[in-house]
Design a protein with these regions (language model features):
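Transition segments tied to proteolytic processing and entry into folded domains
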Residues: 20-25, 31, 48, 85-87, ...
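Generic hydrophobic alpha-helical segments
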Residues: 7, 42-43, 116
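Short N-proximal segments of mature Sec-exported proteins
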Residues: 24-77
Length: 122
């Protein structure tokens, strides 16, 4: 019995670690989160007067709605909790900034604003 306890503890720790690691997101989910992160970064830049962000149309309610709907849809479909969705969004935002990819992704994402199914089944 004494030998089983460490094995069970190791298995429990392994299961806990596995549960904390989110399943890989689909390409559709990653793009929704990537657009959400890009919209958030640009909107923040617009609020702070960043010249690069001001080159885009004003991102207001429509971009916020996209962000909320996309995050909720990905949480539901991918089984993420709030911590998981925050981590996924932060990772996408970091990647956009680290690879100077905001401009190219905005070209893809901006047309999605206002589309009936752009972020999550309106």
């Amino acid at each position: 019995m004494i030998r089983i306890v460490p094995v069970l503890a190791l298995l429990a720790a392994s299961a806990s670690l596995h549960a904390q690691q989110a399943a890989p997101l689909s390409l559709e989910h990653r793009m929704a989160l990537r657009c959400s992160a890009a919209f958030a970064l640009v909107a923040h830049g617009q609020e702070t007067g960043a010249a690069a962000a001001l080159a885009y149309p004003p991102l207001g309610g429509e971009a916020r709605e996209y962000f909320v709907r996309a995050a909720a849809r990905v949480m539901d479909e991918a089984g993420l909790d709030e911590e998981g969705i925050r981590a996924a969004l932060a990772a996408e935002a970091r990647d956009l900034v680290d690879h100077d990819s905001i401009e190219p992704i905005m070209q893809v994402c901006l047309p999605q604003l206002g589309e009936p199914d752009s972020a999550g089944h309106r």
